[in-house]
Regions:
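Conserved helicase C-terminal RecA-like lobe
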Residues: 71, 85-97, 110, 117-284
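Conserved RecA-like helicase motor-core motifs
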Residues: 96-106
Length: 284
């Protein structure tokens, strides 16, 4: 039994789909059709890279909205992998276009992205207690909640940052056998701080990924989810490279602080209200 009638698409869309699927030699013969009108013709465009693609797509949505030919909720951007959402999200934000990711999480809210950004934040400014606490056991270092609590209590008592308390962990009451693990973390962060003086942002990020074994651990899991997370990390690396290229083109210095400031502008975006007019972003 072949289910060939389509009730939602236009015939032009189905004709294009038929043309693409026809090249699959292992498929069973099937031709999709509809009683709907032919609809608008499909426009096919190729771009040199993802940046040009996202800029054109979002620019086209903005133009249609500006001209009154489409509302935001009439528009959707479909892509193959979650990692591709980052460019479309950023372009939408720059164009002040509301959007909603369907069936996924905003790029900068994904666990692996937040973990690695917190490493960069800690290297840049170890007084960021939230960032330091997030990565203290990423990867797992065997520093338990009780130890973390004692260190935080000491930091509060001495009115110092959590990281400064880590640096003098030997003075924390009842720190016990966790001291060597805490010292190992501090030594690691201090080495990254030293390297940050000579490394570019992208080099520093790749060094963190390499030394923590973050991607190696994900690859060892070898699941669909872990592979998607590796793609997200690759996309974050691409973002650092893009930032450096932009700064170079503008004859400005690419700094870790500058990169984190740029990310901060787009990372803390509240979710779109369900009743608002927004563009839909989603994977196929």
């Amino acid at each position: 039994i072949r289910l060939e009638q389509n009730y939602r698409s236009t015939q032009n869309i189905l004709n294009a789909a038929n043309g693409v699927i026809a090249n699959n030699t292992e498929r069973k013969e099937k031709t999709l059709w509809t009683e709907n009108p032919e609809g608008e013709k499909i426009h096919f465009r190729q771009f040199m890279n993802g940046y040009e693609e996202a800029e054109f797509v979002v620019g086209d949505i903005a133009r249609r909205h500006r001209e009154g030919t489409a509302e935001y909720h009439n528009c959707a951007v479909l892509y193959r992998t979650n990692a591709q959402s980052r460019l479309f999200e950023e372009k939408c934000l720059l164009a002040n276009i509301p959007y909603k990711i369907v069936g996924g999480v905003n790029f900068y809210a994904r666990k692996e992205i937040k973990d690695l950004l917190c490493y960069l934040k800690t290297v840049d400014n170890a007084a960021d207690d939230l960032a330091v606490r997030r990565i203290l056991n990423v990867p797992k270092r065997g520093i338990g909640a009780t130890t973390v609590g004692r260190i935080q209590d000491y930091a509060d008592m001495m009115n110092i940052s959590f990281y400064d308390a880590l640096r003098v962990a030997e003075e924390v009451p009842s720190i016990g056998r966790s001291l060597s693990k805490v010292d190992g973390f501090v030594t690691f962060i201090q080495s990254l701080k030293s390297k940050a003086q000579a490394y570019s942002v992208s080099e520093l990020l790749e060094e963190i990924i390499d030394l923590t074994g973050y991607v190696d651990e994900l690859k060892a899991e070898d699941t669909e989810e872990s592979r998607a997370r590796v793609e997200n990390i690759d996309e974050l690396i691409s973002k650092t490279v893009s930032y450096e290229e932009t700064m170079k083109a503008e004859n400005r210095e690419a700094t870790l602080s500058g990169f984190l400031e740029e990310i901060a502008l787009i990372a803390d975006i509240d979710s779109v209200d369900e009743n608002q007019d927004y563009v839909v972003l989603m994977t196929l």
